[in-house]
């Protein structure tokens, strides 16, 4: 997935908390660019550009172009720190990549075809174990989300990662087991109805036994 996010950066001369606070007073966000075969570089980014990019969603799973005096480089955001009160971006780590660089990213799981799920039709509940999954992806092919198809799943069934179709070249980072993404459970009402049906079934054999005793 290519990116349309472009962020302007400037090399940050000063380091330490004092320099970082001074940058934030100017609505600049301190950051670092690292990875590849180049040395890490301390930078500042425009606060308004960061806010706009964050509003667009999927900031941590998009390829980003950083522009320094007309020269561009492709990166991906690996971490972003926010102020605990104002929720403003405080620091960003940017990792240098190209189209084929393999990286670990958390990708959202979207559940589809709920209307074709017998468990939900019967009043069951979808218990989501993982709202997102960690995947190993080429930087140029990061999916925005993956789809988990609920078609045909009934109460008591589980949906595992092997049931989710992943794009070419994308694999789960957990490889030692077929981990669970969601389960289908009966609601309290469904379970109560089932228990009542179970309680009623012995009545007929009991009646037959009593009739035999009378004879």
From Swiss-Prot:
GO molecular function terms listed in the Swiss-Prot or TrEMBL record: 5S rRNA binding; structural constituent of ribosome
Sequence ranges of Basic and acidic residues compositional bias: 206-215
GO BP field: translation
Regions crossing the membrane: none
GO CC terms of this entry: cytosolic large ribosomal subunit
Record SUPFAM superfamilies: Ribosomal protein L25-like
CDD domains: Ribosomal_L25_TL5_CTC (cd00495)
Bias-annotated ranges (Acidic residues): 193-205
InterPro entries xrefs: Rbsml_bL25/Gln-tRNA_synth_N, Ribosomal_bL25/Gln-tRNA_synth, Ribosomal_bL25_b-dom, Ribosomal_bL25_C, Ribosomal_bL25_long, Ribosomal_L25_dom, Ribosomal_uL5_bac-type
Domain of life the protein comes from: Bacteria
UniProt keywords, alphabetically: Ribonucleoprotein, Ribosomal protein, RNA-binding, rRNA-binding
HAMAP family with a match to the protein in the record: Ribosomal_bL25_CTC
Family: Belongs to the bacterial ribosomal protein bL25 family. CTC subfamily.
Function: This is one of the proteins that binds to the 5S RNA in the ribosome where it forms part of the central protuberance.
Quaternary data: Part of the 50S ribosomal subunit; part of the 5S rRNA/L5/L18/L25 subcomplex. Contacts the 5S rRNA. Binds to the 5S rRNA independently of L5 and L18.
Name of protein: Large ribosomal subunit protein bL25
Organism: Maricaulis maris (strain MCS10)
Lineage: Bacteria, Pseudomonadati, Pseudomonadota, Alphaproteobacteria, Maricaulales
